[in-house]
From Swiss-Prot:
Modified residues (Phosphoserine): 827
Domain of life: Eukaryota
Function: Functions in nuclear protein import as nuclear transport receptor. Serves as receptor for nuclear localization signals (NLS) in cargo substrates. Is thought to mediate docking of the importin/substrate complex to the nuclear pore complex (NPC) through binding to nucleoporin and the complex is subsequently translocated through the pore by an energy requiring, Ran-dependent mechanism. At the nucleoplasmic side of the NPC, Ran binds to the importin, the importin/substrate complex dissociates and importin is re-exported from the nucleus to the cytoplasm where GTP hydrolysis releases Ran.
Annotated protein name in UniProt: Importin-5
Primary localisation category: cytoplasm
Gene behind the chain: Ipo5
One of the record's GO cellular component terms: nuclear membrane
Listed GO biological process terms: cellular response to amino acid stimulus; cytoplasmic pattern recognition receptor signaling pathway; NLS-bearing protein import into nucleus; positive regulation of protein import into nucleus; ribosomal protein import into nucleus
Length: 1097
């Protein structure tokens, strides 16, 4: 007994040390605690919690640790305990709750009870702790306030506590919550019951019937939101935000009341900023999660907009603002930033059709207000709505731009800053149309604003706007301004370099350096004349800006030098290449001493990749220096944590952590520092593999070992995309090592790629992974997949196709929804486009398999056949039919004559669809008919005969050569050529040939153009009388066809066909008069094209 007491005493000391501010003491205590066996931990912790004479901090710590133990290690600890100990723990907990007098301590013990209850629901949903439920029912109707709070707290923490009995108890649960929410005497009971109601609704987010059953709790819930806010408690308001985010449909019966309450709270300046912003968050969240439902309440939306704008006016005077040299991060808790962000999100959520007419007048009035804060807010509001109101603003862009440019000359520097912001944002949101329409006005106005020497924040922001403008500016538009741009940028750079030396200020210089880089990047080789003006100063900055506070300037200058080098090309850059490489290498050797958040790192990594593009194979010599740090950055492992909600609340202010709510009181946290750098590093590895090819072979093994696991790096999409992109490129690099090494590498990546196709949650990333997998199969060829691979891949592709059809059905259901409107249709169209894009990637994978394996793969394909047949049914949308046909085209092209086995499924649709309304479908059908003639074997002969009149009808249709139809038409012309070439006895070639010649040349579809020119060469070389005409009278027409083909770049000089065409021309050249006659009938451009062909082929 004494020994146990002594141990318990030791444990109290340990709890004290776990709370110690001394890191060494605390670390040691954590290690000691970790080594205590689980059963002993439970005993010690319970004893400490029960001991009311122990220090309050120690008891609270013990409660937190016991909850964590049950949360993270229940299966290792609890089931191993003897059943009497388990029973004792359960009854002990309930007893302690009843005895506890301290409210905060009681909550912590309730958290333990809830955690235990969560783990005591078995797989069938049976609650293995009936006493816990009885305690809940007894306590909730107790006269003891503490016990009622305890019951509600447990239910809030674990609303699934009733397990499979929930339906049975539903009315009881409802009565319990209603009763507590009507408790007028005890505000804390009302608050807790409202939070518990929200938790219960959220825990049943897919149970629409339950929403209806609990709808009459909403008015009481909203009342609790209101009351708690005025008691300085925003917990119920936060619950309302969660409902708006996850189950907005629950709010539908009382949506107007919800919006009115949110508006009232948002506009009440007696509440603190956080509460007002949360109230606004309810409305903004609904605009994202239930836009169609919200759009019906236009008058309330119209009232919300002035509230957001009023928040944006909530700015403070700051005398040091204009010349601050450090860009402080926006104060994200400020009303101004919250209002701007809300406006941006709401415009995107509800759409410009609704928002722009409501906001336009408000903004115009603000811009005419004598108080600078209103003008600032009006301009920032214009910046914020550009993305959401894109379509509607485009129509009035001229008037907006003219108006905004006036404010670049506003008397107040912060208004000028906001005007720069608006110009920069519009340059991005409306590119490249914005640049095409307003280049003259905008460039002149920004250059003038950059001369504002007394206000460097304004100068820097004007330079930032110029960067946005030039990044998306077509090269041809920028060239006429180059002289003027360069003159301004150079004079400002010289001035700011002097200021850096004299005063140490750098803000404007950082932006100007990036502006120079952006101009060079767009101007490309046209920047050559200005190269020598900038390069010495830029090198000087990199050499001398070594102080810590100049790291960002140095990084941006390194970026600028490498972008200029890429723009002007190797020849011009070589004079400085070796100096620049030495500067980079010197920085690289200091790389290991750099702090993880050093801004130079990502600039360095990108600069190396540009140097690689400039130097090509010569870059290989630097790889030993570059690869170490690059691999180190690409291998960054982020800090992650699985926390319950209470632990997360303690961390939410912690720097750089982001949390995802996993439900059930669990949250996943990740520290985001280093993720962007990791993504950049991975993209650079892709760049090296692409540029250096076999020169990168030494690094392929370490890179593939890094990249393959990153296909599952769910913390950053860009990392997974780079990992996928790298796979086929690494195989290309490894080819030089021979087949054994290549096969080993492929085996290492193949399983992971297939699994990633099955599990990738993001459609954009998924499409990249599928594309890369298809490329890999093309590299590896026949035999690269074993039976297990085929089995798994077949299942995954089948699932993707089934999902495609299911998603289409779901979209049809959404079109029947009571809130359906044209904006909903737009978002459904976007979803549809995403699905179709994945379908194109399924087609890519099947294409690579058919082209590698030929007919051997057809038995495997049969599991997918019904789904592909379904794609080409007449009632399916045109993209389905297009891609279904493409898959059958591949089967005919690569698996014939065996493909005829499936002809019953596709021949009739293929013939029917060659005359389809959709040009994309016509093109796929025409291509199929062409390959049928080329590769299909004798069984396809009658169908070639049937196809000819259909193809001719499409070619001769009045609109056949319009932009949208021309590709389909050219595929029809090519198909006619293939039928004549490969199945000449199926059609009357003599009759068709003159027509076919009159349709040439093809110039849009380059691949089909090569096929038709090749057949034309066959006919000319065999002196076909119809082609040449009597006494060669058709030769001028043939010359014209060849010249047109050359002018439209449809003749590839490296292709054997180009040589054959050039030989035809040369033969005529030797026969004097005929040559003169042919050339005389050509335009000067056509004559030049013929000469070009002769010179190069």
């Amino acid at each position: 007994m004494a020994a146990a007491a002594a141990e318990q005493q030791q444990f109290y000391l340990l709890l004290g040390n776990l709370l110690s501010p001394d890191n060494v003491v605390r670390k040691q205590a954590e290690e000691t605690y970790e080594n205590i066996p689980g059963r002993s931990k439970i005993t010690f912790l319970l004893q400490a919690i029960r001991n009311t004479t122990a220090a309050e901090e120690a008891r609270q710590m013990a409660a937190v640790l016991l909850r964590r133990l049950l949360s993270s290690a229940f299966d290792e600890v609890y089931p191993a305990l003897p059943s009497d100990v388990q029973t004792a723990i359960k009854s002990e907990l309930l007893m302690i709750i009843q005895m506890e007098t301290q409210s905060s301590m009681r909550k912590k013990i309730c958290d333990i009870a809830a955690e235990l209850a969560r783990n005591l629901i078995d797989e069938d949903g049976n609650n293995q702790w009936p006493e816990g439920l009885k305690f809940l029912f007894d306590s909730v109707s107790s006269q003891n306030m503490g016990l009622r709070e305890a019951a509600l707290h447990i239910f809030w923490n674990f609303p699934g506590i009733f397990g499979n009995q929930q339906q049975h108890y539903l009315d009881v649960i409802k009565r319990m919550l209603v009763q507590c929410m009507q408790d007028q005497e005890h505000p804390s009971i009302r608050t807790l019951s409202a939070r518990a109601t929200a938790a219960f609704i959220l825990a049943n987010e897919h149970n629409v019937a339950l929403f209806k059953h609990f709808a009459d709790l909403l008015p009481g819930f909203l009342q609790a939101v209101n009351d708690s806010c005025y008691q300085n408690d925003d917990s119920v308001l936060k619950s309302l935000v969660e409902i708006a985010d996850t189950v907005p449909k629950y709010l539908r019966p009382h949506l107007e009341a919800t919006l009115q309450l949110s508006l009232k709270l948002c506009g009440d300046t007696n509440l603190n900023n956080m509460q007002r912003q949360l109230a606004l968050e309810v409305i903004v969240t609904l605009s994202e999660t239930a836009a169609a439902m919200l759009r019906k309440h236009t008058s309330l939306i119209a009232q919300t907009i002035p509230q957001m704008l009023a928040m944006m006016v909530d700015l403070e005077e700051d005398e040091d603002w204009a010349n601050a040299d450090e860009l402080e991060d926006d104060d994200f808790d400020s009303n101004a930033v919250a209002g701007e962000s809300a406006l941006d999100r709401m415009a995107c959520g509800l759409g410009g059709k609704l928002v722009l007419p409501m906001i336009k007048e408000h903004i115009m009035q603000m811009l005419q207000n004598p108080d600078w804060k209103y003008r600032h807010a009006g301009l920032m509001a214009l910046s914020a709505i550009g993305e959401g109101c894109h379509q509607q603003m485009e129509g009035i862009l001229n008037e907006i731009v003219n108006f905004v440019l006036l404010f670049l000359q506003d008397p107040h520097p912060r208004v000028r800053y906001a005007a720069c912001n608006a110009v920069g944002q519009m340059a991005t949101d409306f590119a490249p149309g914005f640049q095409k329409k307003f280049h003259e006005k905008v460039i002149a106005a920004l250059l003038q604003t950059m001369e504002d020497q007394g206000n460097q924040r304004v100068q820097a922001h004007a330079a930032a706007a110029l960067i946005n403008f030039t990044e998306d500016c077509p090269k041809s538009l920028l060239i006429p301004y180059l002289d003027n741009l360069v003159k301004h940028l150079h004079s400002i750079m010289v001035l700011k370099l002097q200021e850096l030396i004299q005063k140490g200020t750098k803000l404007v210089l950082e932006q100007v350096v990036t502006s120079i880089a952006s101009v060079a990047d767009t101007a490309e080789e046209k920047f050559v004349p200005y190269y020598d003006l900038f390069m010495p100063s830029l090198k000087h900055i990199v050499e001398n800006a070594v102080q810590k506070e100049l790291r960002l300037l140095r990084g941006k200058t390194i970026e600028c030098i490498s972008l200029i080098g890429l723009a002007v090309g190797k020849e011009k850059f070589m004079q400085d290449a070796s100096d620049v490489m030495q500067l980079l290498l010197k920085t690289q050797t200091d790389f290991n001493d750099m702090e993880d958040d050093d801004p130079q790192i990502s600039y360095m990594i990108s600069a190396w990749a540009r140097m690689c593009k400039i130097l090509g194979k010569e870059f290989q010599q630097y790889l030993p220096v570059v690869m170490g740090p690059l691999m180190k950055t690409a291998s960054i492992k982020p800090e992650v944590a699985l926390l319950d909600t209470q632990d997360m609340e303690n961390m939410s202010d912690d720097d750089g952590w982001e949390f995802v709510n996993l439900g059930d009181q669990q949250s996943f946290g990740i520290k985001t520092a280093g993720l962007e750098e990791k993504s950049t590093a991975c993209q650079m590895l892709v760049c090296y593999a692409k540029e250096l090819k076999e020169g990168f072979v030494e690094y392929t093994e370490q890179v593939v070992k890094l990249m393959v696991p990153l296909l599952k790096f769910y913390f950053h999409d860009g990392v997974r995309v780079a990992a996928a992109e790298s796979m086929p490129l690494l195989l290309e690099c490894a080819r030089v090592r021979g087949p054994e090494y290549l096969t080993q590498m492929w085996h290492f990546m193949c399983d992971a790629l297939i699994k990633a196709i099955g599990t990738e949650p993001d459609s954009d990333v998924l499409s990249e992974i599928m594309h890369s997998f298809a490329k890999c199969i093309e590299v590896m060829g026949d035999g690269c997949l074993n039976n297990e691979h085929f089995e798994e891949l077949g299942g995954i592709l089948k699932a993707k196709l089934e999902e495609h059809f299911k998603n289409q059905e779901l979209r049809q259901v959404k079109r029947q929804d009571e809130d359906y409107d044209e904006q909903v249709e737009e978002s459904l169209q976007d979803e549809d486009d995403n699905d179709v894009y994945i379908l194109t990637k399924v087609s890519d994978i099947l294409h690579s398999i058919f082209s590698s394996y030929k007919e051997k793969v057809l038995p495997w394909f049969e599991q997918l056949l019904p789904l592909i047949v379904n794609l080409i049914c007449p009632q399916r949308p045109w993209p389905d039919r297009q891609w279904g046909l493409c898959i059958f085209d591949d089967i005919v092209e690569h698996c014939s004559p065996a493909s005829f086995k499936y002809a019953e499924y596709f021949i009739s649709p293929m013939l029917q669809y060659v005359c389809d309304n959709s040009p994309e479908v016509r093109q796929a059908a025409a291509y199929g008919l062409g390959v049928m003639a080329q590769f299909g074997g004798d069984n396809y002969r009658p169908f070639c005969t049937d196809a000819l009149p259909l193809l001719v009808r499409v070619i001769q249709a009045p609109e056949a050569k319009t932009k949208e139809n021309v590709n389909a038409t050219e595929n029809c012309i090519s198909a006619v050529g293939k039928i004549m070439k490969f199945k000449p006895d199926c059609v009357n070639v003599e009759e068709v040939l003159p027509h076919w010649l009159s349709w040439l040349p093809l110039h849009e579809d380059k691949e089909e153009a090569v096929q038709t020119f090749s057949y034309l060469c066959d006919l000319i070389e065999s002196n076909h009388p119809i082609v040449l005409g009597p006494n060669n009278t058709n030769l001028p027409k043939i010359f014209s066809i060849i010249a047109e083909g050359e002018m439209h770049e449809a003749i590839k000089h490296e292709d054997p066909c180009a040589k054959r065409l050039a030989n035809v021309v040369r033969q005529v050249q030797t026969s004097g008069g005929l040559w003169t006659e042919c050339i005389a009938q050509l335009s000067p451009e056509q004559q030049a094209a013929i000469q070009e062909l002769l010179n190069s082929a």
